[in-house]
């Protein structure tokens, strides 16, 4: 049969994509196409951590006023928080929080390494992988990992443009 990846990293705001990925893999297991579920990692911006807190504590509470460069995952009341929590726990995954700087660095690195220009919210998933890989023993070095880099970079261009240094104009001298 087919083989699922060892881990999948998903940017999480409302938790809808994460819950959908969980359902998709669960369906593949139920029909016998894969034998096991990948670990699902929900990645959230440090300032928008409702799902992260819910997974960690088991207590749900809305966020006051989440703000982040990754506006697509800046959510005060996630519509799918319960299913997202279930997805992480049932797959023995984890939640990861990343800073705006880590998100923007991941966005630039992803573009330089692969040519994929994703919005900051999509780059958060890659930032989560980078953070987990830097930790001790979270994922084996030979793990097969999928990163869902959702949303085109042109959808949210202001944050990456702020990091671009435009060279000064040179006046013609001829």
Where are the model-predicted features located?
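Buried hydrophobic packing segments
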Residues: 17-25, 107, 125-132
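Active-site/ligand-binding loops adjacent to catalytic centers
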Residues: 2, 27-117, 162-174
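Short beta-strand segments
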Residues: 10-13, 41-44, 147-150
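Phosphate-binding loop/pocket of nucleotide- and phosphate-handling active sites
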Residues: 35, 62-64, 124-174
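Conserved acidic residues
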Residues: 6, 40, 143
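Short helix/loop capping segments that flank catalytic or ligand/cofactor-binding pockets
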Residues: 19, 51-52, 156-158
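Short glycine/threonine-rich catalytic loop with a Thr-x-Gly-x-Asp
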Residues: 12-16, 80, 114-122
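Glycine-rich ThDP/TPP pyrophosphate-binding loop and its adjacent helix/strand module
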Residues: 3-16, 20-23
